[in-house]
Amino acid sequence: MDRLTPEQRKKCMQSNKSKGTKPELALAKAMWALGLRYRKNSGSIFGKPDFSFKKYKVAVFVDGEFWHGKDWEQRKAEIKGNREFWIAKIERNIRRDMEVTGRLKVEGWAVLRFWSNDVVKNTTCCAEKVRQAVRDKQGLSKFQTREK
């Protein structure tokens, strides 16, 4: 049974951000410091990545552990209230994440997914991984341009 009234639960859920979270802001700042210039939450890219480098086809997602099902089999057992709803919701999110990643890869995108806690603990390392992915795609991009 939920300890909150439906109105309290609604307010609580509405306060959960889908963009502009602290981990996203930290990664944005670190990438900017490395000279990376990105687009945020671009609706023109399937899956609406948190950060994208459209020219090089690099998409970056910062996934919250609960919402995107980190260690799902273990965490699933820990859900107490409204189990059916939450299990269905998180499993739907996991399937959607796999679909988005798969489709972007088929379309030639490099897809990086970071857990939000990993970004918080290792912001610079995550930003470096993004920079390397962009560099890898820059090299590929130049090679493809020369062949045409």
From Swiss-Prot:
What's a single GO MF annotation on this record? endonuclease activity
Give the matching Pfam families. DUF559 (PF04480), Vsr (PF03852)
Region of interest: Disordered? 1-21
Source domain of life is: Bacteria
Assigned EC number: 3.1.-.-
Keyword set, alphabetical order: DNA damage, DNA repair, Endonuclease, Hydrolase, Nuclease, Restriction system
Class of enzymatic activity (EC top level): hydrolase
Compositionally biased spans, kind Basic and acidic residues: 1-10
The answer to whether the entry has keyword DNA damage is yes
Question: Which GO BP terms apply?
Answer: DNA restriction-modification system; mismatch repair
Return the similarity comment. Belongs to the Vsr family.
State the function annotated in the UniProt record. May nick NmeDI sequences that contain T/G mispairs resulting from m5C-deamination. If unrepaired, these mismatches can lead to C-to-T transition mutations. The very short patch (VSP) repair process counteracts the mutagenic process by repairing the mismatches in favor of the G-containing strand. This enzyme is an endonuclease that nicks double-stranded DNA within the sequence RTCGGB next to the thymidine residue that is mismatched to 2'-deoxyguanosine. The incision is mismatch-dependent and strand-specific.
Name of this chain's protein: Type II nicking enzyme V.NmeDIP
UniProt organism field: Neisseria meningitidis serogroup C
Provide the organism lineage as a comma list.
Answer: Bacteria, Pseudomonadati, Pseudomonadota, Betaproteobacteria, Neisseriales
Encoding gene (name) = vsr
